[in-house]
């Protein structure tokens, strides 16, 4: 069998800002799900994770009711690697950036972090196309009902975040 490389990527920015460990963990999990669900199934090879945060080593985050960049970097890194490690996907590289500047008498920095999860995988050439269900086949649905947590996450994460309302959309995170 010939193999095809697969490359997947996902961001989990808003959840990682609210709850760094589980936010990054579920970001990695969602990306791994995509890797193994492609076609008739793929296999994981390795992952990467990246983080962009506001200015490091400052105390002004305590006033804004949000996690410090240091806390996000440490806990998100733990979450991303924890998920992959538990199912056999190593993180082989990553990146981290901080950003803060003063421009035209305004302070600008990333309050909402960026959490990037990328993956490399392989898929057998014979698995690239899914089969159609045929009469008489048993079809099984796996999963449960949707819960109220996480509802509205896409719209909440797209809102401008300020220091006064950063955690106000906490129910939008799973």
Residue ranges and their predicted role:
Residues 1-174:
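Glycine/proline-enriched, intrinsically flexible loops and inter-domain linkers
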């Amino acid at each position: 069998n010939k193999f095809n490389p697969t490359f997947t990527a996902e961001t989990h920015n808003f959840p990682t800002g609210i709850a760094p460990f589980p936010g990054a963990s579920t970001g990695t999990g969602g990306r791994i799900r995509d890797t193994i669900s492609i076609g008739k199934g793929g296999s994981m090879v390795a992952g990467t994770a990246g983080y962009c945060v506001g200015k490091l080593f400052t105390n002004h985050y305590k006033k804004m009711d949000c996690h410090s960049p240091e806390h996000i970097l440490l806990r998100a890194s733990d979450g991303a690697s924890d998920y992959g490690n538990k199912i056999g996907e190593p993180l082989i590289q990553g990146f981290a950036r901080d950003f803060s500047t003063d421009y035209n008498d305004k302070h600008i920095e990333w309050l909402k972090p960026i959490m990037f999860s990328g993956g490399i995988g392989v898929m057998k050439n014979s698995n690239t196309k899914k089969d159609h269900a045929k009469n008489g086949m048993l079809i099984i649905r796996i999963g449960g009902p949707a819960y109220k947590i996480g509802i509205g996450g896409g719209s909440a994460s797209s809102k401008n975040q300020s220091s006064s309302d950063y955690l106000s959309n906490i129910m939008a995170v799973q």
